[in-house]
A protein has these predicted regions:
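Feature captures the RNA virus RNA-dependent RNA polymerase
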Residues: 10, 29-30, 39, 112
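Aromatic/acidic polysaccharide-binding cleft in carbohydrate-active enzymes
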Residues: 1-14, 26
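Carbohydrate-binding surface patches
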Residues: 31-74
Length: 139
């Protein structure tokens, strides 16, 4: 039953983001650590975006580089929401690798497109072979 619930969850997530995924502009972000991959899709009108950050292996560095998101409208404001995550504690206790998770992971945050492109999102240290899915909605 747990497996079926997982399929239902991801089918609903795909339906919610289908237009962006199939009609948006794809972006790949350069990450300084080769063990981390980041890519996303931004809607043609730049109103929505979805980004995936994948941790392939143990990171080479103790601190993760910020995720600077591409393709957004600099003057717009976006609500950043964590759509999916591995089994890490989303309670303010950072699990076994961190004492505290970035604030946007526990509470949706609203920030400018320029800030997301220049400063970026602080990333958690993820376990190897895991990923997080991030949604953005212009407000």
């Amino acid at each position: 039953e747990e497996e079926r619930a997982g399929y239902r969850k991801y089918a609903a997530l795909h339906k919610q983001w289908r237009d962006v995924i199939h009609h948006g502009v794809q972006w790949r972000m350069d990450m300084p650590d080769a063990t981390t991959l980041a890519h996303g899709v931004v809607s043609p009108d730049k109103a929505q975006a979805i980004f995936l950050v994948s941790q392939l292996a143990m990171p080479d560095y103790t601190l993760m580089a910020p995720l600077r998101l591409a393709g957004l409208e600099a003057s717009a404001r976006y609500q950043v929401t964590l759509l999916d995550h591995p089994n890490i504690q989303i309670t303010g206790e950072g699990g076994h690798t961190m004492r505290k998770l970035p604030a946007w992971m526990t509470t949706p945050q609203t920030v400018s497109g320029e800030w997301l492109q220049q400063a970026g999102l602080a990333l958690p240290i993820l376990d190897p072979e895991s990923a997080i899915l991030i949604g953005l909605q212009r407000v």
